Design a protein with these regions (language model features):
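P-loop NTPase catalytic core of nucleic-acid-dependent motor ATPases
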Residues: 1-77
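Feature primarily recognizes SF3-like P-loop helicase cores of small DNA viruses
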Residues: 29-32, 58-61, 67-94, 100-102, ...
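Short amphipathic alpha-helical segments and helix-helix/interface helices
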Residues: 48, 98-99
Length: 208
């Protein structure tokens, strides 16, 4: 990718994902997500799945149904990483719910065979993939989506030292490294996303 900010933004997001697994965050959610944009078959989905070591792959899913709101919220407590595959297929009717889910630090739900409602810890972070470039439809802003263009085929054959990778992430958290985005970083993300913004219908008609 040609995005000079990608390495830093992904690093912060990765630390936040790890922090959620270790229950270091109770008041805020990992409310941003990397959104990989590129042609079909370039290795986006495999790259997302490979972020988790084989021992944790059971906590990865690329199947979430936003029309079933209760199940979608409960997935936050059951999975470590949720990939919104084919992001542009998410109906605009569910965009506000998606934003709400991204920002949820806990899920209030009744456990099976329990009477009282409990606040369940959120473990899941989100990532997404898309084949099309005009994918952002919300005109109110896109600071939560770290859109990144895949300019070639991703090399997914490189072996990853997961033990070392996550040991470094945990060490960074213990040393107090920041795992949330500043307002300046969010502003930069919004500016970068302009190229991925879908034009309003009236503008599309005007340009025809």
């Amino acid at each position: 990718t040609a995005n000079a900010q990608w390495r830093n933004l992904f690093y912060i997001w990765f630390l936040s994902m790890t922090a959620h697994w270790y229950r270091r965050e109770h008041l805020h959610a990992n409310s941003s997500l990397p959104l990989l944009v590129g042609p079909q078959g370039c290795g986006k989905s495999t790259w997302c799945r490979n972020l988790l070591p084989p021992s944790l792959r059971m906590y990865y899913t690329d199947s979430i149904d936003f029309s079933n709101k209760r199940d979608a919220e409960l997935m936050l407590t059951r999975f470590a990483l949720i990939n919104i595959d084919e992001f542009d297929s998410v109906s605009s009717a569910y965009q506000s719910f998606l934003k709400n889910v991204l920002q949820k630090p806990v899920v209030n739900a009744r456990q099976p065979y329990k009477r009282s409602i409990q606040a369940l810890h959120r473990y899941a972070s989100f990532i997404a993939t898309c084949n099309n470039y005009d994918l952002l439809t919300d005109p109110t802003g896109s600071r939560r989506f770290i859109c990144i263009e895949i300019s070639g085929t991703i090399d997914n054959s490189t072996l990853i030292d997961y033990e070392q990778l996550y040991a470094q992430a945990v060490a960074a958290l213990k040393n107090g490294e920041r795992y949330w985005f500043t307002s300046e970083e969010e502003f930069s993300t919004t500016r970068n996303n302009e190229v991925f913004q879908q034009l309003p219908v009236e503008e599309q008609l005007f340009l025809q």
